[in-house]
Amino acid sequence: MKTKFLLLASLGLSTFLVSCKKEETVAQAQVVKEITVSLAAANENPQPAGRTESGSATIKVFSDNSITVDATLVGLSAADNLTLAHFHAGDPVTNGPVVLDLKPTFTGGTVKATLAAVRTSFIDSIKAGTAEIYLNIHSTQVGSGIVRGQLFNPVMFAASVALSGANEVPAVTTTATGTALLRITADNKLYSKVTVTNLEANDALTMSHIHTGAAGTNGAVLIGLCSSAADFGVTKINTPTPAVINSIKADGLYVNVHSTMKASGIVRGQIR
């Protein structure tokens, strides 16, 4: 009888211990969203001079509101070092504010970050997959960012075009200079931002276009970028035809900015 009692007690204790062990087991967080981001120096606004680094990042969002980021850069200069990485708010031609500091660790060209308890509003925007958010990785030599990439609707073509009066045909004498940022995204949208500074006080910007033509020649308008002075310095979005998209990606083209005093063009720059 005593032996039987001891056996039952032993079984009861084992059951109790197993039950406790099950209760102590914490469910592992599950991946609820995974994103692959293409990174490139060409996506920076503007592209850092002489830099061609590229890479990719894998972003995972978990059910417990944690996020991991694993990124690798290719071609990072041996004289440069990665320093910071953030998520920023902004479309492909905008440099926007930091919305989340990744606080990563760096090993050469690799970036690793794990963030716990990320705010729900940010997690929800990532899950929705429509927000204008980009990953920006900074370095010692390029503090503003050495590579970047949109989390959604990736950039498939990028050009940062320097504009000057010397590029006009014939050349124009002006204090004005500028930059045209051009980005074509995966949904075949053309994002552009044309900025001109130091324009003479007696002049005013009027319009800007992409024209066909190699350096030293004048050509026809391919597509408009700015139709009034108010369009300069702000993001413009066009939906070009497939033929225009292909031309922007491959042909000899230039950006031309027109003004009241220089109707044929005050500053210009070649896309290629």
Indicate where each model-derived feature is located.
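C-terminal motif of bacterial Sec signal peptides marking the signal peptidase cleavage site
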Residues: 16-19
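Sec-dependent N-terminal signal peptides
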Residues: 6-14
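Metal-centered catalytic cores of metalloenzymes
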Residues: 21-85, 89-208, 212-272
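Positively charged n-region of N-terminal signal peptides that target proteins for export
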Residues: 1-4, 21-22
